[in-house]
């Protein structure tokens, strides 16, 4: 009888120990909001989880404008732990609303100062730069007798009427970096006049920054205003497009990482922020973008000019963030009629 009780006690202790061990090693789940391209996420997640096997990621992905609006709507009851891959202009807005937890990740000293928030510790830390590019379908252009544009000004020529597609800036970070750049480069009056002229040639405004290049690749529209990652990738996949970088300069933004204020998984969130700023992560970002937040990591791309980074405009992120609502309200009032229907 005593032996039976002893065995029962031992079994209970072993069972309890195994349960405790399982609980101790149970994975922490981070809810991560992102506007990263779907074809980038898998590699980023795999590398992070290889280094942090005790942390799982639950992704919430959409275009920049949608993710930003969702985060703002959840301000009183945040659902995200971390933001990994969202425009710096959006993160600056969230920071102004007091929605981010400042954190200095390991490796911060290697980050170029212009690719992180100015605060110490920073509210957000950059990953990579994405910038304007035009996807030009050479086959369709030849069929339709369309000359190759080389500048933003060229896109207002009557020959391109109905031939151009671009992202809606209220939905797409790519769309907003274009609109913001035109207003900064040309000034408000001339910038809106430019967009009025461009609007006459727009066939559709999409809710995705990648879609215009995809539409150009298939010939649905011969010209798509997109961004260099999608343009270069699409051409390398064999699409009959030329990648055009307009001569006046390129609008751009920074994909960045930030910790959401109020997260219940702060230590795990810090580990993700550490990884995002690491050399290993930069090596992943470099596979997709010509400019990353740590100088000297990115390698030249044969489809982009050697002076690519110098073609980026002098971008005032504070202005772009502070004036975002006003700009989008005015843009929607003028041009929303040509936007595709939301799914």
Predicted regions and their residues:
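Sec/Tat signal peptide C-region and signal peptidase I cleavage site
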Residues: 20-26
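Early extracytoplasmic/lumenal segment of secretory-pathway proteins
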Residues: 27-93
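Extracytoplasmic ligand-binding site segments that recognize negatively charged/polar headgroups
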Residues: 35, 39-42, 79-220
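A ligand-binding cleft/hinge motif common to bilobed small-molecule-binding domains
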Residues: 89-93, 217, 221-240, 289
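Periplasmic-binding protein-like
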Residues: 110-113, 159-167, 194-199, 205-206, 237-261, 276-298, ...
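A bilobed periplasmic-binding-protein/Venus flytrap-type ligand-binding module shared by bacterial periplasmic
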Residues: 135-140, 180-183, 253-265, 284-285
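An extracytoplasmic/periplasmic, membrane-proximal ligand-sensing/linker region
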Residues: 188-190, 291-343
């Amino acid at each position: 009888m005593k032996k039976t009780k002893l065995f029962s006690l031992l079994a209970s202790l072993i069972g309890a120990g195994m349960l405790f061990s399982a609980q101790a090693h149970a994975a922490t789940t981070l809810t991560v909001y992102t506007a990263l391209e779907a074809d980038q996420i898998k590699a980023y997640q795999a590398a992070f989880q290889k280094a942090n096997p005790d942390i799982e990621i639950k992704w919430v992905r959409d275009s920049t404008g949608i993710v930003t609006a969702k985060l703002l709507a959840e301000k009183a009851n945040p659902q995200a732990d971390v933001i990994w891959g969202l425009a710096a202009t959006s993160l600056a807005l969230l920071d102004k609303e007091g929605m981010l937890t400042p954190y200095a990740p390991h490796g911060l000293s290697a980050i170029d100062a212009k690719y992180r928030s100015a605060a110490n510790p920073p509210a957000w830390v950059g990953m990579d730069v994405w910038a304007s590019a035009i996807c030009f379908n050479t086959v369709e252009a030849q069929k339709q007798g369309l000359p190759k544009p080389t500048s933003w000004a060229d896109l207002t020529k009557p020959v391109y009427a109905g031939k151009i597609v671009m992202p809606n800036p209220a939905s797409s970070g790519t769309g907003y970096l274009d609109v913001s750049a035109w207003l900064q480069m040309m000034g408000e009056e001339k910038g809106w006049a430019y967009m009025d002229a461009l609007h006459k040639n727009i066939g559709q405004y999409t809710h995705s920054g990648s879609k215009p290049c995809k539409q150009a690749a298939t010939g649905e529209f011969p010209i798509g205003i997109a961004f260099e990652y999608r343009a270069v990738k699409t051409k390398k996949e064999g699409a009959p497009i030329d990648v055009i970088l307009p001569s006046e300069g390129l609008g751009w933004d920074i994909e960045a990482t930030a910790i959401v204020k109020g997260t219940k998984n702060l230590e795990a969130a810090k580990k993700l922020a550490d990884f995002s700023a690491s050399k290993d992560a930069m090596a992943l970002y470099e596979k997709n973008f010509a400019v990353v937040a740590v100088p000297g990591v990115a390698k030249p791309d044969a489809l982009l000019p050697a002076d690519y980074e110098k073609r980026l405009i002098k971008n005032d992120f504070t202005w772009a963030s502070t004036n975002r609502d006003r700009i989008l309200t005015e843009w929607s009032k003028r041009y929303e009629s040509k936007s595709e229907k939301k799914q």
